[in-house]
Amino acid sequence: MLSKILGIFKGKEKIEEKSNKIIEIDYNKCKNCLSCYRVCKNNVFAIKNNRVVVKNENNCTKCGECLKVCRYGAIILYDA
């Protein structure tokens, strides 16, 4: 438990991996900075019509890197 708490303070927390999680982009908040696109190692995001889109949701490992780098809070992960 303590290591989990310390991990949070160190910014190393991971999102609980569950198959029922869905990732989306809130386009009311998204500034199209491409941070999520650049940080994702699993090619979850793509650029379509000059916008970042979720292209390969099945590739998402729920690592949380895109959530961490999004300064605008535009990445949403929720239960299906």
Swiss-Prot record:
Binds 2 [4Fe-4S] clusters. Keywords: 4Fe-4S, Electron transport, Iron, Iron-sulfur, Metal-binding, Repeat, Transport. [4Fe-4S] cluster 2 binds at residues 60, 63, 66, 70. GO terms for molecular function: 4 iron, 4 sulfur cluster binding; metal ion binding. Its cofactor is [4Fe-4S] cluster. Gene3D superfamilies: 3.30.70.20. InterPro entries: 4Fe4S_Fe-S-bd, Fe-S_Ferredoxin. Pfam families: Fer4_9 (PF13187). It comes from the Archaea. Residues 21-49, 50-80 form the 4Fe-4S ferredoxin-type domain. [4Fe-4S] cluster 1 binds at residues 30, 33, 36, 40. This is Uncharacterized ferredoxin MJ0061. It comes from Methanocaldococcus jannaschii (strain ATCC 43067 / DSM 2661 / JAL-1 / JCM 10045 / NBRC 100440).
